[in-house]
Amino acid sequence: MKSSLKLFFLLFLAAGSFTAFAASYTDGIEYFKAGQPDRAKILLERTLNDAGTNKAESYYYLGEIAFINKDYTAAAEYYKKGLEADPLFAYNLIGQGKLALNGSADKEQTEKVAEKYFKEALKGKNKKDAGLNLAIAKAYYETGTPGYEEYMKKSYKADKKFPDYFMFEGDVLVNQQQYGDACGRYENAIYFDPNCIEAYVKYSHIYFDINPTLAIQKLEELQTIAPNSAIAQREMAEAYYKNSQYTKAAEAYEKYMQNPNHFQTDRPRLATLLFYGKRFDESLELAKDILSHDPQNFVI
């Protein structure tokens, strides 16, 4: 009976098939918006061909990740595929414009090319779209091209309660090492959209080294808002672990590992936490399974 329970536990973790959680490409977007592009890429690629995936949106974020990694050829291909999937998803046009701004040719000429993409993206009703104007502002900012403030103003005018606007303001302040003011902007984002997952995550990251209790409280608040979010679950587990709350960390990791969008690379952490919690049999069974797939795992 004991062995059967161990086996059930192991299969439960490995497959995630006994869970009510549903895999979704939006988990990848949440990781990207929270500043974790590498994890975002894994999930966006994993869910790309799922029935519920908006491919145009997924390709856009894959393009953004490639841009961050300075793989501009891949970024161009992703934006192109995004437009092929849905020509009306204008963010991919903005991605192409950002690539133009990043060109090494004459700056004046590259700006003219970029402006054509941006003008096309803002045609018709899109002209007053807060998200599209903000994406253009980011394109200017991320390429070091003057002019991002103009599109920030347009974004704010279109929607004064747009949470992504405040998130970007916060990110700019972080780059300027104005962390207190940045947290204020993240709080604004939460105020206008309590479901703004990335705001909770970024806020907690800033505060953890200063006030881990406050950071953990913010993530616990997030659990009530988005209990099925993969990043919310993982961040909660990691925060407990970093704060040496190993029993809570193990429980949080067990919940997270039931999510189809968990990462197999997190399983050694759970095995360690089970050991710390004196759940030796479960820890051993999980460790054996990990080693059967990864004999060189240095943690195990």
Residue ranges and their predicted role:
Residues 33-34, 68, 95, 102-104, ...:
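Register position in tetratricopeptide repeats
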Residues 54-55, 89, 128-129, 162, ...:
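Residue-level recognition of tetratricopeptide repeat
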Residues 58, 92, 130-132, 165, ...:
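TPR alpha-solenoid repeat register
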Residues 60-61, 95-96, 131-135, 168, ...:
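Canonical tetratricopeptide repeat
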Residues 50-51, 85, 123-125, 157-158, ...:
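Structural marker of alpha-solenoid helical repeat scaffolds
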Residues 18-80, 84-95, 101-112, 119, ...:
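N-terminal leader/linker segments that initiate helical-solenoid repeat arrays
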